[in-house]
A protein has these predicted regions:
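Catalytic glycan-binding domains that act on GlcNAc-containing polysaccharides
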Residues: 1-137
Length: 139
């Protein structure tokens, strides 16, 4: 569970203790506010959860109720895609931008999520393939 992952980091990985403590506090607030069982939400070893793999503080800051049902749901594709778009926008992504260089807004917004150049390059390459496929379907 997300709770177990963060709790373990607090007690077993001293260099991540402060970070994990803050994330656990965010997670507990989220569970309390949405009346969720802290042990029922599965996540990664780092405490990320949902289809978008948000850490608790990012979920708090960037998640949106895109389907307008009154709840931000980490396992609802509508909310997740809206939340990911919100995350990218809040981290500098500009609609209709086509600058994929390291100095461009697109690159920087993806890099804000994962500080690994290889990750960003893979996401941008996949983006281009999806865009080409969509354009091909529209012709």
């Amino acid at each position: 569970s997300v709770f177990n992952a963060l709790y373990s980091q607090i007690h077993e990985i001293p260099r991540r203790s402060k970070w994990a403590s803050r994330e656990l506090a965010e997670f507990l607030k989220y569970c309390f506010n949405d009346n969720l069982d802290t042990q029922e939400i599965g996540g990664s070893y780092a405490g990320a959860f949902g289809y978008g793999q948000f850490i608790p503080s990012s979920f708090t800051s960037y998640s949106v109720d895109f389907n307008q049902n009154g709840v931000r749901e980490p396992y609802s594709w509508e909310d997740v895609l809206g939340s990911i778009a919100n995350y990218l926008r809040m981290n500098g992504y500009k609609p209709n931008s086509s600058d994929y260089s390291k100095k461009g807004d697109i690159y920087k917004s993806v890099y804000a999520y994962n500080h690994a150049d290889n990750y960003v390059m893979a996401v941008l390459e996949l983006t281009e393939k999806i865009r080409a496929r969509v354009n091909q379907s529209n012709n």
